[in-house]
UniProtKB/Swiss-Prot annotation:
Biological processes, Gene Ontology terms: queuosine biosynthetic process
EC number of the protein: 6.3.4.20
Keyword Phosphoprotein carried by entry: no
GO MF terms held by the record: ATP binding; ligase activity, forming carbon-nitrogen bonds; zinc ion binding
Naturally occurring in which organism (per UniProt): Ruthia magnifica subsp. Calyptogena magnifica
Cofactor(s) listed in the protein's UniProt record: Zn(2+)
Catalytic reaction list: 7-carboxy-7-deazaguanine + NH4(+) + ATP = 7-cyano-7-deazaguanine + ADP + phosphate + H2O + H(+)
Sequence similarity: Belongs to the QueC family.
Record text on cofactor binding: Binds 1 zinc ion per subunit.
Role summary: Catalyzes the ATP-dependent conversion of 7-carboxy-7-deazaguanine (CDG) to 7-cyano-7-deazaguanine (preQ(0)).
Entry-linked HAMAP family: QueC
Record key words, sorted: ATP-binding, Ligase, Metal-binding, Nucleotide-binding, Queuosine biosynthesis, Zinc
Full protein name: 7-cyano-7-deazaguanine synthase
C-alpha cells in the first residue's frame, strides 16, 4: 500500500532556476509531498517555465501549477519592462534594476493561498543571502516577518495549524548549493538562471544571475554545464 497519505504536504516555489530546483530536491529528500508553484508574471524570458515543468516531473510533484499574473504593467524592473535593458554584472551595494517590486511577497501570497486550500502548513522558497543580487525580499528577516503575518491572516492558522516557511538555502553560497544539488542528483544543465536566456534556455553569460552561477561552479570545482551565448 502506498504511504503517500502519510507524507506531509508542502508548496514549493519553483522558478526552474538553480536555487529553486535545489530547494525542491531538498524538500523531496525530507519526504514532503510536493506541490510546485511557478509564475508567468511578465518576465522577458519564458524558458525558465519549461525548466520548472521538467523538474516538477523529475522530482514527482503531485501537482505543478503555473500562475499567470502581470507585473509588467508596473514598468520598473529590467526583468519585465522592455524599455529597460538587463544590465551587465557589477558589484554594488545598491538594489539593482532587476529587482521586481514586492515579487516574493506576491509569490508567497499565492503560495499561502494554495497551501490553505491544500490543508498544507509548509512552504519552501529558495532564497539565499550569499552570492545574490541584494534583493530585500530574499532576506531572512523578511521571510520571518511574512511567516508571522501569514499566521495571523489565515483560517487554518487561527484554527491552530501554523504555517512554516522553509528556506534551506538561506545561509549557503552558490558553491555549497551546487554541491548539495549534485549530491541529490540534479542535472543543472536543465535549469535556467539567466535573466535574458533565449527561447532554448541558452544563457547570456553577462548578467548578475549568470555571473553568480559561473562563480558558484568555479568555487565548487565542478564543470559548469550551462549553455552560454558568449
Amino acid at each position: 500500500m502506498s504511504n503517500t497519505r502519510h507524507k506531509i504536504k508542502a508548496v514549493i516555489l519553483l522558478s526552474g532556476g538553480l536555487d529553486s530546483t535545489t530547494t525542491l530536491a531538498i524538500a523531496k529528500t525530507k519526504n514532503f509531498e510536493c506541490y510546485s508553484l511557478s509564475f508567468d508574471y511578465g518576465q522577458k524570458q519564458k524558458s525558465e517555465l519549461k525548466s520548472a515543468e521538467n523538474f516538477a516531473k523529475i522530482f514527482g510533484s503531485i501537482k505543478h501549477r503555473v500562475m499567470k499574473i502581470s507585473l509588467s504593467n508596473i514598468d520598473f524592473s529590467a526583468l519585465t519592462d522592455d524599455k529597460i535593458d538587463i544590465p551587465k554584472f557589477s558589484k554594488s551595494d545598491d538594489i539593482p534594476i532587476t529587482y521586481v517590486p514586492a515579487r516574493n511577497t506576491i509569490f508567497l501570497s499565492y503560495a499561502l493561498s494554495w497551501s490553505e486550500v491544500l490543508d498544507c502548513q509548509h512552504i519552501f522558497i529558495g532564497v539565499n543571502t550569499l552570492d545574490y543580487s541584494g534583493y530585500p525580499d530574499c532576506r531572512e528577516i523578511y521571510i520571518k516577518a511574512f511567516e508571522v503575518m501569514a499566521n495571523l491572516a489565515t483560517k487554518q492558522s487561527i484554527e491552530g495549524k501554523k504555517l512554516t516557511i522553509h528556506t534551506p538555502l538561506i545561509h549557503l553560497n552558490k558553491a555549497q548549493i551546487i554541491k548539495k544539488g549534485l549530491s541529490l542528483g540534479i542535472d543543472y544543465s536543465l535549469t535556467t538562471t539567466c535573466y535574458q536566456a533565449d527561447k532554448s534556455g541558452k544563457a547570456c553569460g553577462i548578467c548578475d544571475a549568470c555571473e553568480y552561477r559561473k562563480l558558484g561552479f568555479i568555487e565548487a570545482k565542478v564543470a559548469d554545464p550551462t549553455r552560454y551565448q558568449i
